[in-house]
């Protein structure tokens, strides 16, 4: 009976030891699973943030492209009517009027118009050393040789720009200069079209160059005033 008691105690102890070990080992998988769940939650948030950032970057990139397209259209359209281009159009028109035939205008009015609307580069060249030498040589040629009639007005325009005082040249690019230029242009246009008789005669083969030049000068003077 004593042996039975000892064996039963061992069996009981072993029987109680297994559940104790089993109960002690059970919480570990739960901790691991809980850790895995929390880790999965932490890993999911950065992916969501990165997706939101990519979406925001895509929207901002599209808005930037639209803004660049609009600004490129503006930059393409504005240089066509810049002040520099308008000055060159007026200068070419004035030179064409100086040499044009088939018009009844007083061409002497073209000289101050040229001085008021010529680009600053041309005015600086005329007032510089090269312009003074050109005027000096032209004056010597005019004194000792026969001077072509077509070159009289360009020579006078060169001398006018050289000897013009600062107070007179300072109205270039201002409202006073624009008003004076528009008045001269309208007077020349009135003379040209009134002496041409009809609009059809103004666009004849002999007068078409002067007509286009006068229209160009008048339109440019009006745009300068605006």
Curated annotation (Swiss-Prot):
Q: Which GO terms describe its cellular component?
A: chloroplast envelope; chloroplast inner membrane; chloroplast thylakoid membrane
Gene name as annotated? COR413IM2
Among InterPro entries, the record links this protein to: COR413
The annotated transit peptide is positioned at 1-76
Location comes to: Plastid, Chloroplast inner membrane
* Keyword Plastid tagged: yes
Q: Which organism is it from?
A: Arabidopsis thaliana (Mouse-ear cress)
Q: Which GO terms describe its biological process?
A: cellular response to cold; cold acclimation
Task: Describe how expression is induced or repressed.
Answer: Accumulates at low levels in response to cold treatment.
Which residue spans belong to the Chloroplast intermembrane compartment?
A: 101-103, 151-152, 198-205
Membrane topology recorded in Swiss-Prot or TrEMBL? Multi-pass membrane protein
Q: Where are the transmembrane segments?
A: 80-100, 104-124, 130-150, 153-173, 177-197, 206-226
The UniProt entry's sequence similarity note says: Belongs to the Cold-regulated 413 protein family.
Q: Which residues lie on this side of the membrane: Stromal?
A: 77-79, 125-129, 174-176
Signal peptide start and end residues: none
Q: What is this protein called?
A: Cold-regulated 413 inner membrane protein 2, chloroplastic
- Which keywords does UniProt give here? Chloroplast, Membrane, Plastid, Plastid inner membrane, Transit peptide, Transmembrane, Transmembrane helix
Q: Which Pfam families match?
A: WCOR413
The main place the protein resides is plastid
């Amino acid at each position: 009976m004593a042996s039975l008691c000892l064996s039963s105690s061992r069996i009981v102890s072993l029987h109680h030891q297994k559940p104790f070990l089993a109960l002690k080992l059970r919480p570990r998988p739960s901790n691991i699973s809980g850790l895995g769940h929390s880790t999965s939650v932490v890993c999911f948030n950065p992916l969501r943030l990165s997706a939101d950032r990519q979406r925001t970057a895509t929207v901002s990139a599209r808005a930037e492209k639209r803004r660049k397209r609009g600004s490129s259209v503006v930059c393409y359209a504005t240089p066509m009517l810049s002040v520099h281009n308008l000055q060159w159009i007026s200068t070419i028109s004035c030179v064409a009027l100086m040499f044009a035939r088939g018009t009844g205008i007083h061409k002497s009015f073209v000289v101050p118009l040229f001085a008021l609307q010529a680009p600053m580069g041309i005015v600086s060249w005329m007032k510089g050393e090269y312009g003074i030498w050109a005027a000096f040589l032209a004056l010597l040629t005019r004194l000792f040789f026969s001077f072509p009639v077509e070159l009289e007005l360009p020579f006078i325009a060169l001398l006018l720009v050289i000897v013009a005082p600062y107070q007179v040249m300072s109205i270039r690019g201002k409202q006073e200069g624009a008003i004076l230029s528009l008045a001269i242009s309208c007077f020349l246009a009135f003379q040209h079209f009134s002496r041409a008789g009809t609009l059809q005669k103004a666009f004849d083969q002999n007068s078409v160059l002067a007509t286009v030049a006068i229209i160009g000068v008048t339109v440019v003077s009006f745009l300068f005033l605006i």
